[in-house]
Every structure is written in C-alpha cells, then in structure tokens.
Amino acid sequence: MRKKLLVVSLLLSVLEIAITAQEKPARRMNYFPEGRDIVCVNGQNRYTRALYGGHTLFRLETSDRPIFATYNNEKSKNIRFYLTHRGLTLRLDSTDYCEARYQGGWRGYKVRDKRWGSAELQVNSLARLDNEGAIWQFKASGFEGDVKLSVKMCQTAVLKMNRGGDLGLVPRSNFDPSQDEKGLKTLEWDATGETYLVFSDNEMLEHPTTEKGREIYTLTDEGRKAIVERVEFITPDPYINTLGANICAAADGTWDGQTWQHGAIGWRVPLAGWRGGYSGDALGWPERQKSHFDAYTKSIVTDVPQIYPQPSQDTKNLLARAEKKWGTGMYSNGYLCRLPGRNDVMNHYDMNLNFFDELFWHFRYDTDTTYLRKMWPYIKLHLEWEKRNWDADGDHLYDAYCCIWASDALYYNGGNVTHSSAYNYKGNRFAARIAELLGEDPTPWQQEADAILKAMNRRLWLKDEGHWAEFEDLMGEKRLHKSAAVWSIYTPIDCDACTSEQAWMATEYVDREIPHIPIRIKDSDMDGKYQTVATTNWLPYDWSTNNVAHEEVMNTALAYFQAGRSEQGFNLLMADILDGMFLGQSPGNFGQISYYDKARSEAYRDFADNVGISSRTLINGLFGILPDALFGKCYIKPAFPKEWDSCSIRTPFLSYKFHRTATQDIYEIEQNFAQPLQMIVKTSIGRGVFVETEGISDKKQIIVVDRTNLPKGKRNTIVNSSRTLDESQQYLTKMGLDEPTPSAKFKTIDISKYFNANVDDIFKNEYLSPRPPYTTLEMPLHGIGQWCHPERMVTIEDDGFRAKINKKLFDTGLGFSFISPTTGHNIVYTSLWDNYPDSIDIPLKGKANAAWLLMAGSTNEMQSRIDNGLVIANYTDGTQDTLRLENPINWCPIEQDYYLDGLAFTAAEKRPYRVHLGSGTVSRHLAPIVGICNWEGKTRKDLYSAEPQIIENGAAQMLKMPLNPKKSLRRLQLRTLSNDVVIGIMGITLESAPK
C-alpha cells in the first residue's frame, strides 16, 4: 500500500511541476521598427490593426496582408481585392511576398508575386476623417500589359460581436466574408499607374478619377498627419521612435468629439475616470481637455444633500456595496455621475479621484485663472464628497471605493488605503494652491493635505521594509496588509506623497516582491532580457486583483522614472512595448491585457487607460517633462538609459534636444506653454537624490549641466523584505507542510464536544455583524463572492467525506486517521464574525512531535500574504509554539484550489494536503484528480488558466504542526485574525516519533 501511495504521489508531483512552472510559449517577433513605421513581412495576423478615422465607432480593420473589414455594428463589411494580369487572377492577401507597414492611422503594403515577374503593387489604406468611410490608394509598377484590380465587398461572417469585435474577445474569423457573401458588391477597374477606391458607409464602393481620388486621399492623410505628427521621439532606440505617431493615433481613437472614451474599440463608452483623460494634456490637446472637463463637471451632483446616515449598504447586492439611492452619502452633492452632461445617472464607481487628478494635471500645463475659477466650485465639492464618504472617522486616511482601474474584486472593508489617501493628499495640496491663486484662504486644504501625509507616514509607511502597506484594517485586529500591489507604490509616488528617498525604496519593493515574468522571444538576442510584472502576488485569482495589464506595467515604469531609477524603468517600458506592440497580434497596440496574463491573455486594443498612462510614462517619465504652471515652473527630469548620448522630443507644448559630451549634458529647449514657465533640469545622482540646474522662462534657451560639479549620490540603507518566499525544508516544516514521519505513532483526539457546526454550513450562514459603520465595499452576506459578484455561491457538501468514515475514523491513506462523526456537527468554526467565537481552546495531554490538523474554512484575495489565523500549542510550562495560517502558503479556500504557475501565482514548494469533501480523496494535487469547474458550475478542463479552480463540494485541508516533543501539552488554541474569513478544525491527531 505504501509503495502504491508513493508511486501515485510521485506521478502527481510530476504533474504538479508541469502545472506550476508554466511559462507561456515564446513568440517570434511579429513586427519590427523602421523609422516611425512598424513593419512585417509575410505576416499572418488578420483584422488586428484598426484605423479609426473620425470620432465614431466606425473603424477599418487592417491585416498583415491587404484584406480588410469595416466595423459598424450590423453594417460591418469584409473587403478583399484581386489583381488580374495576363489572365491570372490573384487575391492580394495570397501573394508570395507582402511587406506591411503601420504608422499612426495608416497601413501600407508592398505586394509582389513571382508570377508577376518584377512588378509590384503598393497599397495604402486610410480611414476617412470626414465620414464613416475609407480610401485605398494603389500604385502599380513594372507590369507589362494590362493590369486590373477588382474588389469584393460583402457582409462579415458575424455581425453581433462581443465588445465590438475586439482582439481576444472574438475570433478574427468573425471578420471574414459571410459564407453566402450576403450583400455582395463588386467593382473592377484598370489599375495601371495610380488608382483609388473609396468606401462610404452608405455601403457604396466608388472608383473615382485619379485626380479626385488623390484629392480625397491627400486631404485625409493631411488630417491624419495633423493628429499623429504632433509628438515625435528621436532616440538611439528604434522601438521608442515608433511610439509618437502611434500613441497619438490611439488616443485619437478614444476621442468621441466631446470626451475621452473608455477605449477605442472594446470599451467604446463614456468614462469619466481611469487614466484615459491624461492623454489630452500629455499629447497637447488642451481644447479637448477643456471639452472633457466641461462635459463631466456638468455630471457632478450639486442639488442633492446627504439626508441618510452611513452606512447605506445595498441589501439587494447582499450588503457588498452601496445602495443606489439619492441622498445617501455616496449619491449626494459632489458625486460624479456616469454620463457626460447628466448629473442624474448613477454609477457604482468613485470616478472622482481619477477625473480630478487629470484636471489637476491640466492645471500643471495651463494655469488659466479664468478656467481655474470655473472649475474651483467643483474641486471643492469633490473634496468635500471624498472626505464625507471615505474619511468618515476623520483620521485623515481614506477608504477606497472602486476608484482605480483595478477595482473589480478589490474591497477594503472601510479600511485606510494607500492609493486613495495619496490621491486625496494631492487633491487637497492642489486645492490649497488654487485657493491661493484665486485669493482665497488655502488653510483648510493645506491642513488636510499635511494631516494626510503625516498619517500615511505614521500608519501606512513600513519604515523597516521601505514601502507602503496596501491598507490598514478598520475592523478586527486593525492590522496592516503589507503585501502591497503596484498601485500602492506608483500612486503615492505620482502624487508626491513621499520623499524622493521613499520613492526610490518603494520601487525596490517592486524589484523584490512583485512577480516578474520574462519576455520570451524566439531566435532573438533579446530573449529573456526584459521582464514584465504582475500587479500583485495575491491569491486566489479574481479579475483585476492579479493580472498582467499593460496600463499597470506602464504606470509602474513611470514610478521607476519618477524615482530616478532610469535603467529599471526603461527595461520595464521596453518589456511592455515588445510584449504588446511587436510580439503581439496588433502592431503599435496600446492594449489592456498582456499575453502573459494567465486568465485573459492578449486582449483589447488601444484601451484608453493604457493610452493615457503610456503618454505620461513617455513624456513625463522617460523624457521627464514635468510642467508645474501653478508655480510658474517646468522641470525636465530625464530618465534616459545611460548609453543614450543624444535624443530629442517634440510636443506641441515643449520640445528639446539633448546631447551629452564627456563632461556636460546639454539641453536645447523650446517651450510653447500658455504661460511662459521657468525651465529647470533635474539630474539624478542616485538613490532618490536630484540636483537642479535652473534656466529661465524664455521661449528658447540652452541649459548646460556640468557633470563634474555634481555631488556624489547619497547612500541609503538597503532594506530587505521579510516576505521573500522561503523554499527551505525548515520553512516547509514550520508552515505545516511536511510529510508523515515513517513508522511514527499516531494518537487520534476526540474533539467532537467542541464542534459548533457542520463543515458545509460555511456559506449557508448570514454574516451580519460586525460590519463597518460606514458605506464601503465589503464581503457579501454569505461570506463568499465580492462586490462585483455578490451572488456567487458554491455547493459545499461533505456526504462523500462522511461516507468514508468507518467506526468514527477517517483514514487519510497516509498512515493515520482522524476521529470524525458520520452525522451531526463535524467542525469547530472560529471567526471575527459574530456567528462563531473568534477563538477556541481544545485541551490536550501528553507529548508529541507534531499535531496533524484537519481544517477547513474560507479566505480570499484581500487576505492574501497575511496570517489569516493562528494555531497555538500551549505547554504545561507556559511556553507555546505557533502555526501561522497564511494564504496562500498553508491556508486554502474551502471552495477552490489555488492556481500556481511559479510566476505571478506562487506559494510554497509543497501545497497542503487537501481532502475532497465530495469523495474523501486526499492529495496535495486535488484539482487534477477530482476536476474543477468555474463559478457557474461548468466543468473546466484547462488547468493552465488562472481562472478560479472551483472544487465541486469543496475541500478541507491537512497540516502537520511541529511540536516540541520534550514538553507536555496543555491545550491547542485556534484563533482567527482576518476579517471576512472563517477557520475551523475538524480533527486532531498527534504524531510521535517511533521508539
């Protein structure tokens, strides 16, 4: 029996290694940089690079070869071309050779085929700006004799597409011709020389005269160039040089004529928050910014006072989020509503923080006092609303109510949160300065800003570890959650809620603790050179709590640049550029989700959140242009790689050329701000120390930094994190993950008189108290789910486990058993919920080397990398040993298995033994044996996806708690520490060494 178990264990271990060390396959470079173009030869991606044209949802989908589709809901069309020469007709997407180029809103092709001899066809495509249409330019050269072009246009294979038919959401084949070529239209023309084809959204195809076609094409291209040539980067790095035109085109794709949208394609809906609104100022569209801000300030509630006290949780959503009711704290004066120009449409987000941060950034570019005065009432309303709702206890630290992109499944239970506190610090600091400029008393806002910063440093900054905590609990033990997400690093840095030394140290936390994932490239010397990052190291996975998201990577790169860590920032920037724009399916794409995300993989194109923060990462970060018009200054704080000796940037508001000599850094600057600003160059000398070289406020100037006069950089203490994963055997033993000792003696302990529940009661209960006294996002009523999905439920059923019990003993198959009943209560639960005691003492006698514990309970992503509970062994001499129950090391959620990949999702080298409650099966690798399903109960066969691995009927777990064999036991105490969770013991068996 032992041999059979050993063989099974070894086989499962091999399977576990295969599952938990899963790098995604390396990709070949799809695209390469050449000047401002992104180029591919004989590429295979279809309908992946969108050209946007005007400011509607219409777009032209282009491919790596000249086959196209238009998207316009139910009017979407497939458009394909044919060339006929010497009696041979070829579809243009099937030739021997095709070079495709993309540059900000334009896609061009050089097409050749051996059957044409030395002839070549140039195809240029544009989406029109003046209507929902497109134009193609054809230039045929080297053809001997007649050459004709023809076009077929028909309905696409699928019309109704999820998320607008975006990448990663629907198959690209949806844009192929419909099977019956429904609505087929054709056109043929003489293709000699230069010819054109025009598509208009009234479903017409037109072959105009060359003169008319050239006029339309030139006008369209000039309009495109006015958009994409506003920003230019010239650097030693060819990848960076492509970004100016492409980011402008992507940003323009997210503009609807009045406001910035959530995305250009998949999320093409109005959105006041997130980071899309940074694009306008960073890329030099101040008129668009004012349009955006004007539209949404009309969405701010101004005539609904708060009349209902906090909390105001929604019973229909099982108390997980705020009730949508006018006059509650959230839905009252100061609240920013969902749609532009309307202050009567509720949303479930706090969009205020991001929206007003973008407004404050606008004032850094342009301190127009007339516009300041116009916006000032809304700024005051916003800050009053934030204070009233999210700092209701007045301690100057703020709760976070889904106020950043990573908001789904993110909830803080009324706690004190780093990122929201940082935003409010900045908001109050800017309000104080604006008040001063407008002749008002700045004191109230300055005092609040000072108090927030003091509280953040005193309560959220981890001095010994050199970074901010994610949050501080309001309830229960009021503990700090130290495993911070990247947003809890980059937000306080971006909001200047820190010293430059703190910023440097906080980015070192990212180096140590945030998962890094290598960018794998086939047949390239860049293979593995760069690494991208996940947003957190939290488990179990839920959407937006542990992802590889382009916008989060870019914002983290910006934080590195701001902290003065230029090399690390550039490496992260390059990782993201390669991942999304050159290895991905869409050239020059500013997408949302990375290929390396184990739940979604590559998804979405030109997502506004990424476009906005990427524009800032490049302009405010890499090139370091930091206007501060509120104080009449503009800082240039470059973060170039050390090998760059020259580069330049051109934007509508400021351009400069940089070059380095043996001893000097020279900046040739030309500014075009609305108000002339004093130029100041900030040079990093390491570890958060910068030296300023002052210029003047003239339009054109040269600033020279003499590096021989720079002081040596300051050295600070290097902080080591205590949470770096320990893979030693001693650590595994300490965390209860050891195997049974061969030939050990086991003594089962009857703890049935302490049982207070059935194990499957856990999600049948209503957990009503204690709950926060303030409106917040919190655990749903039944102790499972999250605010986006409060209705989530699973079946926990222990019939199979009980059926395996023989004479009150459950045989683990590992050489020992637990006493457990076949009917009635079979667990003692503890919790900070009032439903159960927060701790339980179980008397014990004798001596033992270890205590085997059969346990079950709950945990979630907001309780990850923190002790959820303690098991304390008390000895008769007054001493004790403690087993810490930490998610995900040795504490598992009853309803699911952890997905582990050795990258973004890591735990200890060994998993805890799990006991399937539906069958009694025992294994460290339960999911491959009993199967998994999704939240909806549908069977899942893909063990390589991070999506939740729900175990039907649930699973308990077993831990081996080490004890001191020389000491006599008095009692075992189970104590729950984390809010929201339930922890229970089903059985105890003592292990003693063999004589």
Report the location of each language-model feature.
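Non-catalytic C-terminal accessory modules of carbohydrate-active enzymes
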Residues: 72-79, 83-131, 555-733
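Acidic, contiguous internal or C-terminal segments within carbohydrate-active enzymes
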Residues: 113-159, 428, 654-685, 834-852, ...
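Substrate-binding groove/exosite segments of carbohydrate-active enzymes
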Residues: 222-374, 480-498, 528-563, 567-574, ...
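Acidic/polar, glycine-enriched structural segments that form the non-catalytic walls/loops
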Residues: 18-30, 101, 116-122, 127-267, ...
